[in-house]
Swiss-Prot record:
Required cofactor(s): Mg(2+)
Protein name in UniProt: Orotate phosphoribosyltransferase
Assembly and interaction partners: Homodimer.
E.C. designation(s): 2.4.2.10
The keyword Magnesium is assigned to this record: yes
Keywords attached to this entry: Glycosyltransferase, Magnesium, Pyrimidine biosynthesis, Transferase
Family: Belongs to the purine/pyrimidine phosphoribosyltransferase family. PyrE subfamily.
Physiological role: Catalyzes the transfer of a ribosyl phosphate group from 5-phosphoribose 1-diphosphate to orotate, leading to the formation of orotidine monophosphate (OMP).
GO function term, MF aspect, one: magnesium ion binding
GO BP term, example: 'de novo' UMP biosynthetic process
Amino acid sequence: MQAYQRDFIRFAIDRGVLRFGEFTLKSGRTSPYFFNAGLFNTGSALAQLGRFYAAAVVESGIAFDVLFGPAYKGIPLASATAVALAEHHDRDLPWCFNRKEAKAHGEGGSLVGSPLAGNVLIIDDVITAGTAIREVMQIIKDQDATAAGVLIALNRQERGNGELSAIQEVERDFGIPVVSIVSLNQVLEFLADDPQLKQHLPAVEAYRAQFGI
């Protein structure tokens, strides 16, 4: 595990974004942990989050021309990542996002910010079912751009209804890498090393054994 990944897990726990207990997911599964990126909800938290995304961008080695944040959750994530790349990695890159509803007046259209052109890195919080990413892929295709990859905060490494996870399905269907700041592997490693949180390790390991990929 990289230092920034360990720092990100600690940061997510401290912010209440990553919690352990018993949670019912949309899928109906009872999960021993829950990740809610909406709780990165202050200026300093968003700035710090952008630095973690930027570190993961650099680590991934994915070549791209523009960052894209899908509405709505992806918008602040893409902007924070763009700021962090410029301030901390000397990479001043364009970014843009989409509106859920196209606008007929003003600048018009459904895209805001830089033109969506060339190789596009999509920034989002998680991929649950993959539906949102499929919509984004169509937006990129409509602009004659190319998806270079997807970066999310957490890969749950959890299969859907079939044998693959939603992330693996996206990788298979679109032939692009999906990378994350951390995956469940790193969360398990963090729990094993933390005396106060180690109590949650058996439940998370059991969940992984049942639903993991």
